[in-house]
Amino acid sequence: MACSVHLVLFLTILLSLAETPESAPAHRGRGGWTLNSAGYLLGPVLPVSSKADQGRKRDSALEILDLWKIIDGLPYSHSPRMTKRTMGETFVKANTGDMHILDKNVPKEEATLDSES
């Protein structure tokens, strides 16, 4: 009888220890580095608190997010207008950079009009 009492007491202590918060796996939220669908490496999600006493931490977290956007070139690394070129800008000779000296491989306007008809 004394052995079974000790066994029950021992099992009760083990079960009470197994239910402590320290032994349970804690969900720490989304963290770590991951890839998005385009294959870009994304950093961990920074928790931004709205408490007044953590305003400085919130500001530094926002600064880090701004730096990530600058590094990744988000939302655009340059304005969309800069990517659109005229035909002349596209075929300017690279070594001169002069708009009036075109590359020899550029088809003449007459040749393109003749091929369309």
Curated annotation (Swiss-Prot):
Question: By its UniProt entry, which InterPro entries does this protein fall under?
Answer: Galanin, GALP
Q: Which residues form the signal peptide?
A: 1-23
* Disulfide bridge positions per record: none
Q: Does the keyword Secreted apply?
A: yes
Concerning Pfam families, the annotation shows:
Galanin
What GO cellular component is one of the record's annotations?
A: extracellular region
Biological process annotations from GO:
behavioral response to starvation; defense response to bacterium; neuropeptide signaling pathway; regulation of appetite; response to insulin
Q: Which residues form the propeptide?
A: 86-117
Question: Where expressed (tissue)?
Answer: Isoform 2 is found in brain, thymus and skin. Isoform 2 is found in the skin, in pericytes covering microvascular arterioles and venules on their abluminal surfaces. In larger vessels, isoform 2 is expressed in layers of smooth muscle cells. Isoform 2 is not detected in endothelial cells.
Identify the domain of life: Eukaryota
Do the record's keywords include Secreted?
yes
Q: Give the location in the cell.
A: Secreted
Entry keyword set: Antibiotic, Antimicrobial, Cleavage on pair of basic residues, Hormone, Neuropeptide, Secreted, Signal
Q: Which GO terms describe its molecular function?
A: hormone activity; signaling receptor binding
* Annotated family: Belongs to the galanin family.
Name the PANTHER family on file. GALANIN-LIKE PEPTIDE (PTHR20950:SF1), GALANIN-RELATED PEPTIDE (PTHR20950)
What name does UniProt use for this protein?
Answer: Galanin-like peptide
Source organism of this protein record: Mus musculus
Gene responsible for this protein: Galp
